[in-house]
Amino acid sequence: KEIKAFRLNDSNRISPLTQAEKKTYQLPDSLDKISWFRVTKYLSEIFYGGYLLAGPVDIGPLDNLYSFNGIEGSRFRLSGKTNYRLSRRIYADFMLAYGTKDKKMKYDLGLKYSFNSLTKNPYSFPANFIGVQYTYNTFIPGRTIENSNYDRLSLSLTDIVDYRLAFNKSIFLEWLYETKKGITINPYLKFQEVKAYGDWTFSDRDSVEVSSFRKDRIGINIRLLFNGTWIQNQNKRITVGGNFTSMNINYEYGFDNTHLIKANAYRKVNLMPFGYIQLWAEGGYMVGRIMSPYLFTSSTYNSIIYHPNAFNLMKVMEFFTDKYIQLIAVYNLNGLIFNRIPYVRELKLREEFNIKMVYGGLRDENKFLIDNLDVKTFESKPYIEAGFGFRNLFQVLGVEYIRRITYSEGLPELKKWGIRATLGFRF
């Protein structure tokens, strides 16, 4: 079909292509015939996409193939998804995981039907698909379950292991529609049963401890992207370029008469020649008597790997709230200082400063939910951590020093600060 489309396009040209223009079309084909180029291209796709490309199936994410924690022990996971080589309409994804300590199998299976047959990915612009996902897997209570993804090898490289897990058994139905003006509409319906995993329980709305409960709800996500430019590969989309803004709004109604609204925004501002600033702002509010696994807790990344829009020194499940506001600011000087230091300028390092803060609370009617979780809510001050470091060492490496500014009382000195590494190209 692609060859016929090209011939039709070529035959309908007003003027024929010159020899130089024809060679431009032939260049990609000639490069693909060079063995070292094919190998480099294949390895680059694995590095950036995180998947092992195996014909009609992509195996990955590779960072999730193995992880370990104190509850499951060594967790082995095989997951992947089909790609356009199998079908440009129907896409499937799967996951199987097994823990050597708990000796339990976890799994999920998803199907997506794309209304756009010209793309190589259901999320390719402009996305338009319906999907269904069945999940039987563990998650960390308090995190957004759809994005918890705690079983990454990089997250296993930490000395912070005191978190709890729960089982999520759910059916998720969605429709995602994206306009050419950068607006994405994503209504969904979820039927879910949550079960505590291990020697702990939840508190229900009557302050009674229970080991499991149901949470069915309907919701909608709306995403807005302004002045955005992105790179689309087979597995993900990376927003690049200069000044752009993205916003997400999520509303959810629980069939137990609860409401959730959450919004976040990202803004990148170029200050050339003084570098650029990245800003993440986020807030959420819940109405009704919420079960403890659905309270808000900040995104953490307890690893030797630095994450720009998560808290690197906050413990998992350290703070629980039913309302919160969060701000993260990163200022990259783009070599403004290092480029003026002899010899150091040859390394082309990029200085970076960051500050992260979050503040929230629990209404009196929900405070009992955390009594048996050994967690806390905020006092009269926000949680703050800040750091500085450099990027672009050998084009891909970076080092970050982070300091915990508040809520550090009683912590050993080594828990108040940390050094983290980064790996990857910056756009």
Protein language model features and the residues they cover:
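Exposed, low-structure sequence patches enriched in small/polar residues
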Residues: E2-F427
